[in-house]
């Protein structure tokens, strides 16, 4: 039967930490090594790797669409033809998708843009969370001690043994941690912000924008009852929302857009949408990769931390349970 959700009692506010169903998790692969992968990103990437390289910068929007459609068909066929590598392609209803926890950095009706890692809403900079992390290029002179690693909150996952050696490395750090590490001249010769390179498969995946995770947009976040003008240039930003989340039959024929069989030059949204991003800004799978989150994917707000484990320690080892974080309000991490 059709999926429905009982209306909630709360309202998502800007900078709230939110639990929601993974939007891109409607389709996934059964092979264990690919179960957590973004299916659509894989399809486009595989398709592009199997095709001859093309210069998208010199193409019109319509020409780009034909290229990306071809990438998708080639990538999807390759995955379907190699079940021994990828497993089966399966579908998940909304309530069976993985729960994600991210911060809401954009509300319905706002225009979002990211400049040098800072989120701007309607032209004004949004407040950065106190513990936001970005990647830094660190020139180590000697290994970071366990005490210093704990102080700057670097786990063994962030700092594996092969990286904790003299040389140049990339670490996720808060501004305070970066300042602390930079002040320790015996350990680090330099600590500089990492300039994240261009990555092709950001949202929307079927448009060559030239955006990066640190310089992204502008993009308008749809609001219920608001109308957007549809052209071949704007369609990639809202195509998935109209087709998948709002259950419409959308097609492009001879350069014209049709919704449910009728020629369409505009569309009025049925739901509110939210822009979610992780506080580990350059290492987060979030709306920059799969777009706005529809209201019917929202589960709620986390209230408190009931269990916190140190992933660098084994069970039975002193300090495995981080008692200082237990039962703390999630709001303490704003």
List PLM regions with ranges:
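Extended hydrophobic leader/signal-anchor segments used for secretion and membrane insertion
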Residues: 1-334
């Amino acid at each position: 039967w059709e999926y429905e959700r009982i209306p909630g009692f709360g309202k998502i506010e800007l900078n709230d930490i939110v639990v929601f169903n993974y939007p891109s998790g409607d389709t996934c692969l059964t092979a264990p090594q690919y179960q957590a992968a973004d299916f659509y990103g894989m399809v486009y990437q595989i398709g592009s790797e199997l095709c001859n390289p093309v210069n998208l910068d010199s193409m019109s929007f319509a020409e780009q669409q034909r290229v990306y459609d071809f990438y998708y068909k080639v990538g999807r066929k390759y995955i379907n033809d190699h079940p021994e590598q990828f497993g089966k392609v399966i579908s998940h209803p909304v309530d069976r998708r993985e729960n994600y926890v991210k911060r809401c950095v954009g509300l319905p009706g706002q225009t979002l843009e990211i400049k040098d890692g800072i989120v701007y809403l309607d032209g004004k900079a949004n407040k950065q969370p106190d513990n936001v992390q970005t990647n830094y290029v660190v020139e180590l002179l000697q290994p970071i001690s366990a005490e210093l690693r704990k102080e700057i909150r670097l786990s063994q996952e962030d700092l594996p043994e092969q990286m904790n050696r003299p040389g140049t490395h990339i670490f996720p750090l808060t501004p305070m941690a970066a300042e602390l590490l930079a002040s320790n001249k015996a350990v680090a010769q330099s600590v500089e912000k990492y300039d994240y390179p261009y990555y092709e498969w950001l949202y929307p995946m079927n448009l060559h924008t030239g955006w990066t995770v640190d310089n992204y947009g502008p993009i308008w976040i749809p609001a219920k009852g608001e109308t957007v003008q549809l052209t071949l240039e704007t369609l990639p930003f809202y195509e998935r929302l109209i087709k998948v989340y709002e259950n419409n039959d959308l097609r492009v024929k001879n350069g014209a857009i049709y919704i449910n069989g009728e020629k369409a030059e505009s569309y009025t949204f049925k739901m509110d949408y939210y822009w979610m991003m992780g506080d580990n800004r350059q290492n987060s799978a979030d709306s920059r990769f799969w777009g706005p989150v529809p209201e019917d994917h929202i589960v709620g707000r986390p209230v408190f931390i009931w269990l916190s484990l140190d992933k660098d320690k084994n069970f039975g080892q002193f300090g495995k349970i981080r008692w200082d974080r237990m039962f703390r309000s999630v709001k303490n991490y704003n």
